[in-house]
């Protein structure tokens, strides 16, 4: 969804434009607010669908032959990305809208002290360079070297990975939040998913492979 324009010889990131249909400040009454939230959620669903469709129709060429190798958590750039991946932000905001829409229906029946929402496990997210990762495990279970730089027509770009892991300051050691410790044992653990990255195996063969990175807690 987020494409690195540097692949085509530019030096910045390209983000598709986003337009929402109204905002909460222009709404009046609970019914209008509910319709507004639904409209915003539908808008972001439409944007996500357009982004996915756009990614699927990208055709490799001599100038952007690697454009189809991007993941929402992998970025090729000449500098550290300043923001999380676009699709990641869209999913986070849509989840917020869904939660807000649900809380509006139950708010009048809820105790004010219980209206706040907390995650079961605390997590942190940040961009990590290939130099920091160094190695990773691919889909076959083999350990491969993650290459720091990717060659492009007009130079080289660095590989960045947006990783999410359990926070060391949260409930990782004390158990999951909301679990009754008198009856249950729980633990927050970092889980991984596969993303595609440029790597080198133990036989010095360089290629794009799916590797595991930390993606949730």
UniProtKB/Swiss-Prot annotation:
GO terms for biological process: cell surface receptor protein tyrosine kinase signaling pathway; modulation of chemical synaptic transmission; negative regulation of neuron apoptotic process; nerve development; nerve growth factor signaling pathway; neuron projection morphogenesis. Keywords: Cleavage on pair of basic residues, Disulfide bond, Glycoprotein, Growth factor, Secreted. GO terms for molecular function: growth factor activity; nerve growth factor receptor binding. Disulfide bonds join 121-188, 166-217. The keyword Secreted applies. Residues 1-108 form a propeptide. Its main location: secreted. Glycans are attached at residue 101. GO terms for cellular component: axon; dendrite; extracellular space; synaptic vesicle. It is found in: Secreted. Pfam families: NGF. Belongs to the NGF-beta family. PANTHER family: BRAIN-DERIVED NEUROTROPHIC FACTOR (PTHR11589:SF3), NERVE GROWTH FACTOR NGF -RELATED (PTHR11589). Promotes the survival of neuronal populations that are all located either in the central nervous system or directly connected to it. This is Neurotrophic factor BDNF precursor form.
């Amino acid at each position: 969804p987020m494409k690195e324009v540097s692949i085509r010889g530019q030096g910045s990131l390209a983000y598709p434009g986003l337009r929402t249909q109204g905002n909460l400040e222009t709404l009046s009454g609970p019914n209008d607010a509910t319709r507004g939230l639904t409209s915003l959620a539908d808008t972001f669903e439409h944007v996500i669908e357009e982004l996915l469709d756009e990614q699927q129709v990208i055709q490799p060429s001599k100038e952007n032959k690697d454009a189809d190798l991007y993941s929402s958590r992998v970025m090729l750039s000449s500098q550290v990305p300043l923001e999380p991946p676009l699709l990641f932000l869209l999913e986070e905001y849509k989840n917020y809208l869904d939660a807000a829409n649900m809380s509006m229906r139950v708010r009048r029946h809820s105790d004010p002290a219980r209206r706040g929402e907390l995650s079961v496990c605390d997590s942190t997210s940040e961009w990590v360079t290939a130099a920091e990762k160094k190695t990773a495990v691919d889909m076959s279970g083999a350990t491969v070297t993650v290459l720091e730089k990717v060659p492009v027509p007009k130079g080289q770009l660095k590989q960045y990975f947006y990783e999410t892991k359990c926070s060391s300051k949260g409930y990782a050691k004390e158990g999951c939040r909301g679990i009754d410790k008198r009856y249950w044992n729980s633990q927050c653990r970092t889980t991984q998913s596969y993303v595609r990255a440029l790597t080198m195996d133990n036989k010095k063969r360089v290629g794009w492979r799916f590797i595991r990175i930390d993606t949730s807690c």
